[in-house]
């Protein structure tokens, strides 16, 4: 329990630190960057959809492009997951994402950092156990070398 709380607090502090470290945009800058910001919002939503498609297809190469090497996630069950584990799970028979229906997403961009929140309904298996249901989640992205890469994620399974 204490470890889970520590990991949760660490993730929250990391996300807050990244967001707070970004410079504030001036009002004049906001109008100049509206079109690029809209393009970035569309790009991030597409990445989220690509992530779901790659998970369904067990496409380790595509997942590897989306996830930063340092990516860490706090799963719905309170366990942390790394990029290496997700890529290894693409080769495991007891893990699958059979159906995935994306719900609405909200994207907030702070310079080279973005936070995407959303929901999905899925039919899935993890370690041979049914994990199907409705989830809400948060993904944190950082733009590295011109590409958005996921650096942190958190998901919560909603009660039935």
Which ranges hold each PLM region?
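A beta-strand edge to alpha-helix "cap/lid" segment located at domain peripheries
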Residues: 8, 22-160
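N-terminal export/membrane-targeting signals
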Residues: 1-22
């Amino acid at each position: 329990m204490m470890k889970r709380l520590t990991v949760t607090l660490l993730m929250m502090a990391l996300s807050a630190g990244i967001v707070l470290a970004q410079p504030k945009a001036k009002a004049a800058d906001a109008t100049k960057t509206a079109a690029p910001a809209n393009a970035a919002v569309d790009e991030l939503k597409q990445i989220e959809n690509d992530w779901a498609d790659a998970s369904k297809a067990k496409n380790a190469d595509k997942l590897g492009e989306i996830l930063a090497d340092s990516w860490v996630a706090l799963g719905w069950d309170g366990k942390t997951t790394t990029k290496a584990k997700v890529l290894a799970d693409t080769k495991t028979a007891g893990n699958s994402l059979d159906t995935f229906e994306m719900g609405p997403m909200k994207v907030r961009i702070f310079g080279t950092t973005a936070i995407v929140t959303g929901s999905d309904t899925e039919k899935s298996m993890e370690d041979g156990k049914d994990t199907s249901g409705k989830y809400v989640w948060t993904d944190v992205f950082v733009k590295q070398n011109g590409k958005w890469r996921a650096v942190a994620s958190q998901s919560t399974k909603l009660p039935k």
